[in-house]
């Protein structure tokens, strides 16, 4: 049923060459969506590998590269998506996380974080939502950040940008629900980064002062976040709209 409904529908995922983006692309391909993934210039090989992983699902797929701080990238994403079918799902997964003391944050860094985390999410949604409205069905999913809800040191620009995504989610959800498009925000907790030694599960990170209490005594993994995103993209999820869904094992319970 899902694969038939999703035929010729395109899921666009930004910042999706690996980790949560890759896991989500695989699950959406399983549901029959054609897949377009966007990546920055540093992850091209990972993007190619992700596309290779999608081959077994017999769907159309492609990737594009570009810096979301350069807003021309939005047009590149839209044009590439249209070549695969009708843009129907947008997962705004790309994001910058720059650490700096509040009083030392350079305004250029502030603007870059806002451009990538907020402006690009807005502009991608604006560019693609027209096609969702025309078919009276679509999904916009913003990937938020736990820091927007609990705060964080040395990340004022990141915290502010992720909080803005919650507001953007609510605005889109109210404006487009009568036209068949829902918008939700998924907020991962501490997720294992298999590419980085720094975030390997260890006593150090479990005791880190900026790590919330991990009630399950472990980090999450990208597949667990991707499962939530993929379920929101099902036809059966029409009644879930304007929500902020936390995936953190119970470490933060609003």
Describe the function of each predicted region.
Residues 177, 182, 240-242, 248:
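Short, small/polar-rich loop/turn modules that mediate ligand/substrate recognition or access, typified
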Residues 130, 174-178, 238:
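Alpha-helical segment proximal to the catalytic Tyr-Lys
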């Amino acid at each position: 049923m899902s694969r038939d409904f999703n035929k010729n529908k395109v899921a666009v995922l930004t910042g999706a060459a690996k980790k949560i983006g890759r896991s989500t692309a695989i699950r959406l391909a399983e549901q029959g969506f054609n897949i377009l993934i966007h990546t920055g210039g540093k992850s091209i090989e990972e993007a190619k590998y992700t596309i290779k992983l999608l081959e077994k699902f017999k769907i159309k797929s492609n990737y594009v590269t570009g810096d979301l701080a350069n807003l021309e990238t939005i047009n590149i994403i839209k044009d590439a998506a249209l070549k695969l079918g009708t843009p129907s799902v947008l997962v705004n997964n790309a994001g910058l996380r720059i650490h700096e003391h509040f009083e030392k944050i350079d305004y250029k860094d502030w603007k870059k974080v806002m451009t990538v985390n907020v402006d690009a999410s807005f502009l991608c949604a604006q560019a693609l939502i027209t096609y969702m409205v025309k078919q009276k069905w679509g999904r916009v999913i913003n990937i938020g950040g736990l820091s927007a809800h609990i705060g964080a040191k040395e990340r004022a620009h990141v915290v502010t940008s992720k909080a803005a995504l919650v507001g953007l989610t609510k605005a889109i959800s109210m404006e487009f629900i009568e036209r068949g498009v829902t918008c939700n925000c998924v907020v991962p907790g501490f997720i294992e980064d298999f590419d980085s030694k720094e975030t390997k599960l260890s006593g150090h990170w479990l005791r880190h002062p900026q790590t919330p209490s991990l009630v399950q005594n472990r980090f999450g993994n990208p597949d667990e976040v991707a499962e939530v995103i993929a379920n929101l993209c099902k036809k059966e999820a029409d009644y879930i709209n304007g929500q902020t869904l936390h995936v953190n094992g119970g470490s933060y319970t609003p």
